[in-house]
Amino acid sequence: EGWIEGWGYDESLLAEGRTPLKGDLDQVSADRPVFIRRSDYHSAVVNSKALEMAGIDRNTPDPEGGAFGRDANGEPDGRLIELGAVRFLEAHAKPAKTFESAVESLLKLKDHYLSHGILTTTNMMVMRGSDPEPLTLYREACRRGLPVDFNLYAVWQGGEDSSGMPDFRADELRGPVRYAGIKLFADGSISGKTAAVRNPYKTAEGEKLDYPCGMMTLEEPVFLAALSYARRNGVQLSIHIMGDRSIDAVLDWLSDADPWLADVPSVRLEHASLLRPDQLERIDQMRLKPAFTTQIIFPFAEWRSYRASLSDADFNAAYPVKSIAQRLDA
């Protein structure tokens, strides 16, 4: 009984060369909900039962920061495009873990962390105020013997209101397990063809994209509200951002900003996969210079998807680590 769950599919590696749809997963089970995350952890696909439990039908509007895949008749086809859609289904249909089971799950990570010499780590996607509350959860796991320090980044849930989330208390920002910042998502992933890019994605024969140039999942008023909140609370603002089109937008929104943290960068751009030379030059002239975490693991782990998605020029220009290091103190 209960949910059938999985993770890790990449449609470019499947024999069918396409994303599974609800009809495919209905063959797994018609009476149990099925939920499969894509390899990028941004999108997912579910069966008809899961859609029914979440109340998602042709009249359900797309949520903020995501979209529901639909067939030619406007009916949901099972695709949950980007995190906004995934979170909608989780909030409306999936049961939350109990506090005890969540603590036990964290404690199981002890041997894994220690075997790799990891004593400090970061969770970039916690939902502050959820049940169980992340900070309480991680602190309890550490109290019971998990010997790891945790920096938690709370996903922004305040919308366009800079007071839309409660301010951090001083005790939440101190100690070996603490909140370290706020997380935003400006776009999707390159392998999933949802990162916001200037040049349209390549498509396979017969493939039709809902968003040929990806999708922005962040709007300026929301960004400015989160920026104001981070400044007021003295924490870092981290932005998931992959495509050059989304980088253009965020640089526009940051153009007049001043830094507010002294010891660490006030803003982090996570991934910055397609960062153009003119954008690097622009950043070099800004008062607030964001830091970069441009992980080159993606072209190795997902190179087939990147090859299938990007033009040769964009593929060869992705993750310009050397250019960033030479141009910026990043």
Regions found by a protein language model. Name each.
Residues 176-194, 288-299:
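Non-cysteine beta-strand/loop elements that form the S-adenosyl-L-methionine
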Residues 1-165, 184, 191-246, 265-266, ...:
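Divalent metal-binding segments
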Residues 134-137, 162-168, 247-259, 281-282:
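Distinct, well-ordered alpha-helical segments
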Residues 140-150, 170-176, 232-233, 255-265, ...:
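Secondary-structure transition/capping motifs at alpha-helix termini
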Residues 110, 139, 227, 251-255, ...:
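Generic hydrophobic alpha-helical scaffold/packing signal
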Residues 265-276:
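Aromatic- and carboxylate-enriched substrate-binding clefts and catalytic-loop regions
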Residues 274-330:
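Active-site-adjacent C-terminal substructures of enzyme catalytic domains
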